[in-house]
């Protein structure tokens, strides 16, 4: 039997798969995961979630299944505020060790 080669990922699946917008996709995935967590914790139906978020039920279903490519980060942040969460955006200088900034998400 041949050995299986395992390569450690970068922590961003979308970057590992070569997506050009990998940072944005990772942030969206994290936002959707938080939305799904709130929906589950509150035991909301997809219909009730759609009413709260101002979306259609099929759109909520797609989001909760991880299909969010056509949804902006802004819209996902708005969904979180409609679910009773405050959103705080912080912009800070990039450390000297990096030339480009990056997007990260911290959830309290």
Regions found by a protein language model. Give the residues of each.
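N-terminal flexible/basic segments that precede or flank functional cores
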Residues: 1-33, 97-108
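Short, amphipathic alpha-helical "recognition" segments used to contact nucleic acids or chromatin
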Residues: 28-44
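Conserved interaction-surface patches within small, structured recognition/assembly domains
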Residues: 36-38, 46, 61-66
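Short alpha-helical DNA-recognition segment
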Residues: 44-61
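Glycine/charge-rich, flexible interdomain linkers and switch-proximal surface loops
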Residues: 52-54, 95-99
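DNA major-groove recognition helix of helix-turn-helix/homeodomain DNA-binding modules
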Residues: 74-90
